[in-house]
Design a protein with these regions (language model features):
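Acidic-enriched, low-complexity/disordered segments with a strong bias for Aspartate over Glutamate
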Residues: 19, 26, 34, 41, ...
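BZIP DNA-binding basic region
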Residues: 1-4
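Short terminal alpha-helical segments
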Residues: 10-73, 154
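Charge-rich, solvent-exposed alpha-helical interaction surfaces
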Residues: 23-30, 34, 58, 87, ...
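Amphipathic alpha-helical binding modules
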Residues: 100-158
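Long, low-complexity or tandemly repetitive, helically biased scaffold regions used
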Residues: 67-120, 127
Length: 158
């Protein structure tokens, strides 16, 4: 291996720094793209879909991630959009229990998606990433995830 001159080491360090920064930008862009894709899927299923199971899955995933990120951003549990998300959580829980009641809960879920749209600018990418990681951990656990988990994130005791 050839020994580098001080100038060569400096160029190598600069290139490694640029590569690391580009990798971080690409990673955060992928997180943004995934959250945006989940948001679009949830909106499509909520507004036009008739598959209640898919609606519960996509909307519930988005709800958990944004509730986690909003909680990390310090949004008050009494914030109107957090209350709307709490109602969305209850509607998704009821819909999961009775998949035939899709029209009864559609308006609450649509309102919750609007609240999510308003809360997303307050959330950091790191918090969204942590929320998606926490969601996957909960879904892969034995206990799973339910309405109570979202209520705890929003700041409401059982």
């Amino acid at each position: 291996m050839r020994k580098l001159s001080p100038y060569g080491r400096k160029l190598l360090q600069r290139q490694q720094t640029q590569d690391r920064q580009q990798a971080e930008r690409d990673f955060f862009a992928a997180v943004q793209r995934d959250v945006r894709g989940l948001q679009i899927d949830a909106g499509l299923h909520c507004w036009t879909g008739n598959n209640a199971g898919t609606m519960v899955n996509t909307c519930g995933r988005l709800l958990y991630i944004v509730a986690f990120a909003a909680n990390a951003a310090g949004v008050s549990p009494d914030h109107p959009d957090m209350r709307i998300m709490r109602g969305m959580s209850e509607a998704l829980g009821d819909l999961a229990d009775d998949l035939d009641a899709i029209e009864r809960h559609r308006a609450s879920i649509q309102s919750g998606l609007g609240a999510i749209d308003r809360l997303l600018p307050l959330c950091t990418l790191v918090a969204l990433l942590e929320g998606s990681y926490e969601l996957e951990q909960r879904l892969n656990s034995v206990r799973g995830m339910g309405t109570q988990d979202v209520r705890e994130l929003i700041g409401v005791a059982a």
